[in-house]
Amino acid sequence: MRPYVLGLPRYANVAPLHHFLRLEGFRVLHAVPAELNRLLLSGEVGLSLVSSYFYLKHQDSLGLLPDFSVAVLGRVYSVNLFHKGALPHLARVALTTESATSVALLKLLLKEAGAGPRYERREGGLELLSAYDGVLLIGDRAIKAYAALLPEVPETPHALPTRFGEVEVADLSTLWFQRTHLPFVFAVWAYRRENPPPKALVQALREARREGLGRLREVAEAEARRLGVHPLLLQHYLWNFRYHLEEPDRLGLKAFAEALGLPFAPMFYPE
């Protein structure tokens, strides 16, 4: 019998969920969110951390773990539009190829800001600003790009700047909070309804999350070493996340669905 496959992106913001994960009889497959979305639909992955946009688009065929999320109330630091000039005046924007959720959120927010730029999918980092008015980066790439602009890391996250000369950093989660006063849910654990995860796997994920959050400084230091950035920046970053899909997070996910013109009728994993 093939082992049940768990899909995980290699991003710092999900490290508290899997850094201490102990699995027996299961296999882990690492990929970027866009690839994990495809693998879940094809059946190559049984349970995966997937983008919220993907989940909402396919919720009629997917089940949802009821107490897991990757969400933020306010600033996220790792879903950033690096741009030159005011948002309503952006003409060309380069988009990450790694995530559907961040792209959908950016288009929604820029439309509401009165912008109508031409969007192009591009691989790369801040060097793209030589040809584009804005560059959307997510995950570790966004963290490293922000760290490269930062002269030093302040003791408090409230002092982290958002302007570096002519380059501004628009944090999409902050813009969402200003719009809704709700958290933004970036990812959820989803599975195909005909292939729910074994209870032992779900319990292992809960235990790993509990240990990861209890030893968050240790997780942050490990991720900082991996990315080559200041550990204090990673601590500021990881302390912001909400990993339990609580009622405010569900309301935020529902608000995102409504903004996209999609339903929100989740089928939760049976306990």
From Swiss-Prot:
It catalyses: chorismate = 3-[(1-carboxyvinyl)-oxy]benzoate + H2O. One of its GO terms (molecular function) is hydro-lyase activity. It comes from the Bacteria. Its EC number is 4.2.1.151. It is an enzyme of class 4 (lyase). Pathway: Quinol/quinone metabolism; menaquinone biosynthesis. Gene3D superfamilies: Periplasmic binding protein-like II (3.40.190.10). SUPFAM superfamilies: Periplasmic binding protein-like II. The keyword Glycoprotein does not apply. Keywords: Lyase, Menaquinone biosynthesis. InterPro entries: Menaquinone_biosynth, MqnA. GO terms for biological process: menaquinone biosynthetic process. Catalyzes the dehydration of chorismate into 3-[(1-carboxyvinyl)oxy]benzoate, a step in the biosynthesis of menaquinone (MK, vitamin K2). Belongs to the MqnA/MqnD family. MqnA subfamily. This is Chorismate dehydratase. It comes from Thermus thermophilus (strain ATCC 27634 / DSM 579 / HB8). The gene is mqnA.
